[in-house]
Every structure is written in C-alpha cells, then in structure tokens.
C-alpha cells in the first residue's frame, strides 16, 4: 500500500514539474465572401442558387497556447465542415508557417448552414469555390499567426452551465417512422461549457464555448450569409466584454460588466464549437429570411455563457499535450437517398476513416472528432473519461459524415439513412480511442 501511495505522489510531482506558465493569444479574421461571388451555400440540398446577400459577417477565430515547451492552436470557423483535404493542407501549412505541430491542432467548423461551401466536400468543384477555399485557408493561417504574435502570460479556467436551446430532432411519427422533428423526450445534452483565457490583470483574452446544436435556425429558403446562432452567440459575448452591449439591469448581477473586465475594441475572441449535435436541432427555427430567432437564441447562449463565466476560477500554470489517431470503420452506401421509411437496404462501400484529436490543457480534455456525432457517444465519453472536464468538439480535423451511436441504428431516421458507417464500430472506436490517448497523457 505504501509503495502505491509513493508512486502516486511521484506521478503527481512529475505532472506538476511538467506544468509551465501559460501564455495565450487570440485573433479573428473575416471570411465573409465578396458580395456577388458565385458561391453555392452549404447544408441544404434543395437550394437551387448561390447566396444573394450578406446578413452578418462570418469569421475564422483562433486561440494559440504555450506552456513554455509546447504550443497548441484551436481554430473555429463559421462554416459547415472542415473537408478532410482542407484539413490535410491546412495542418501542414500551420505546422510549416506557425511552427505548431498537427497533433496539437484542432480545426473545427460550427456546422453553419448559412455559409458558402468549401471545395473538397460534396459540392462540385468550381473556380469560385476553389478561390473561396484558398481564402478561408489563408484566413485560418493568418488567425493563428496573429494569435501567436499576441501571446502573453495568461490564466485559464473552465466551468459549465445549462441552456435549453437544443432539442433532439429524431421524432417517431405515426405514418413515416422516425424522421426529422422535435422530440423533447429524446436524449439531449444541455451542457454549455465555457473555457476562459484571461491576462494577469483579469481581462479576458478569449473564450471557447462548447454546445451541442445544429446551426440551422435559418432554413433552406434563406439565401443570406450568416453565422446563424453560433455566430450570434460569439458576437454577443465579444460585444458584451467590449462594452458595446448593455443588457437589462434585471438580467442578473453577472450581466453587469465589471470595469476591470472591459476589453474595449472588438472585445475578446470567442470561439463557438459544436458538441455532439448530430441529432440536436435548435429548439425553434425560422421560416423564410426572418433572423429574429437567430439573434434571440444566440443571445440566450451568449448571456448564459457570461453567467457561467462568473463561476470560473483561473490558474496560470498549465501543461499542454496533444495526440491524434485515425480509427477506421466498415463503410456502406444506402441504396436510396434519405427519405422517411421504416426499412432500408445498403451496399458495402469503402471503409470510413475517423480522425480523433485529443488536446489536453492540464485536466481539461478537448476531444475533437472528424464527423457529425450523435449525442449518446459524447455522453458515454464524458461518463467514462477520467477527466471530469471533457468536451467533445465535432466537425474537427476532417469530415467523416454522420456518426450514430450503436443503438440509434434501430431507429431508421435521417441520420441513419445518410451515414456512411455500418453499425457496431464507430461508437466503441471513438470512446476507446480517446480513453487510450488519455492514458498516454
């Protein structure tokens, strides 16, 4: 018993010795397409034209971290995917130009259905999409380089709250079986996680928000560029800490900005990341091009993020560590396109690679998955993880499509008729893959 206790103490001392003084920097770069660019919009197959107007600008945001021996970067952009080809090219560029190794890099999309498509996905290639993809890649590299140039001594901390902005969308209907709908009894993770980085005076440098919801408040009849509720949430928090917003005084004490936290300018950089939202839609969605709900739901998330921030305790000491691996699962092709039904057939197809990226910031585990993960996989990982502060960031470092949990295949829903994965592999491969990497930390 004494021997094991001594080993535990030595392990803790070794971990503490590896920790260094944290430095953090952040930046945002505009990736809004030029007005009139001939670009298709992403996410809805029944759109017949490219975007026609710009409602709100969209951004690539980056946080760069340094513990004295290791540097890491997190990039989040207000687009639908990170195509695997784009990840490969971008990770090499960031490694080459910023000196940040790919195993310490997470590049994630908020899964915005109100943004242009990138080349390398399902959208047919065109000179316009190729040019826009180059613009986005350049912007991401620029954001990382600017964030690195702004590195400064920092403290960090994480806290969680809840927000009732999402709802399970897999609904059992009487005539069509399971399909897209509104299922308040279905599994849904309401956790809103807020990771704060501040300078040594207490002013926020950046935030990372993590919440499981499709960025689809605006539907297929919308032809205006928007960051949807993800962009609205980031914008609210940025403007709050810049001092540009003055919420009602009866919204709670935390919504009164303290002078020492006022950043000014454009405020701190706020990255929104999508949790396991493959089966999670906004609790309310818009018709046509009315953006009222985008702003309302974004503000609900933003206000709650500010309230959660009030509970965060920060620490200047940190250890950074990253690792990535690719797990491969048997593939399939559903014989007919997605439509409501109770049965379907499929053919064998190529195996599907799923990239897992684990970024550890002390005892905070950021688990990136290259796909559209259903909620129960994330909930299982959080239960089994040895780290209580475990966040799943989806649409990260590639695009493997829908990733259902094993039990979900029994309900023939939209996600099941579009996934490229056979059942029985991905859930275990993802959870066990992350647990294995955590053991190596």
Indicate residue ranges for each PLM-predicted region.
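Sec-dependent signal peptide recognition
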Residues: 1-7
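Hydrophobic h-region of N-terminal signal peptides that target proteins for export
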Residues: 8-16
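Charged, flexible cofactor/metal-binding loops and thiol motifs
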Residues: 302
């Amino acid at each position: 018993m004494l021997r094991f206790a001594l080993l535990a103490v030595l392990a803790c001392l070794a971990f503490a010795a590896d920790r260094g003084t944290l430095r953090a920097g952040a930046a945002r770069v505009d990736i809004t397409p030029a007005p009139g660019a001939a670009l298709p919009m992403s996410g809805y197959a029944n759109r017949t034209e490219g975007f026609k107007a710009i409602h709100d600008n969209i951004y690539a945001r980056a946080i760069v971290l340094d513990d004295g021996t290791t540097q890491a970067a997190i990039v989040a952009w207000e687009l639908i995917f990170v195509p695997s080809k784009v990840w490969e090219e971008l990770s090499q560029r960031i490694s080459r130009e910023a000196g940040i190794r790919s195993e310490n890099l997470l590049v994630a999309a908020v899964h915005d259905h109100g943004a242009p498509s990138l080349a390398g996905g399902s959208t047919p290639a065109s000179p316009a999409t190729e040019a826009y993809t180059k613009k986005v890649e350049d912007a991401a590299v620029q954001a990382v380089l600017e964030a690195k140039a702004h590195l400064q001594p920092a403290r960090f901390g994480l806290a969680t709250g809840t927000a009732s902005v999402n709802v399970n969308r897999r609904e059992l209907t009487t005539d069509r079986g399971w399909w897209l709908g509104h299922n308040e009894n279905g599994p849904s993770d309401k956790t809103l996680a807020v990771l704060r980085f501040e300078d040594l005076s207490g002013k926020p440098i950046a935030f990372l928000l993590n919440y499981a919801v499709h960025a689809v408040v605006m539907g297929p009849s919308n032809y205006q560029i928007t960051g949807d509720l993800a962009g609205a949430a980031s914008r609210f928090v940025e403007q709050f800490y810049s001092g540009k917003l003055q919420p009602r005084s009866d919204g709670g004490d935390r919504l009164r900005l303290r002078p020492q936290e006022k950043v000014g300018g454009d405020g701190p950089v706020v990255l929104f990341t999508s949790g396991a939202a493959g089966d999670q839609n906004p609790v309310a969605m818009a018709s046509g091009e009315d953006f009222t709900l985008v702003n309302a739901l974004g503000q609900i998330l933003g206000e709650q993020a500010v309230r959660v921030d009030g509970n965060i305790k920060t620490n200047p000491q940190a250890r950074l560590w990253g690792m990535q691996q690719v797990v491969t699962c048997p593939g399939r092709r559903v014989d007919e396109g997605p439509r409501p039904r109770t049965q379907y057939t499929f053919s064998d197809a190529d195996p599907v690679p799923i990239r897992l990226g684990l970024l550890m910031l002390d005892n905070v585990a950021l688990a990136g998955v290259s796909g559209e993960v259903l909620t129960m996989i994330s909930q299982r990982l959080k239960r089994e993880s040895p780290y209580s502060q475990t966040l799943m960031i989806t649409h990260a470092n590639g695009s493997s499509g829908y990733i259902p949990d094993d039990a979900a295949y029994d309900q023939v829903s939209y996600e099941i008729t579009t996934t490229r994965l056979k059942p029985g592999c991905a859930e275990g491969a993802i959870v066990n893959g992350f647990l294995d990497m955590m053991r190596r930390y």
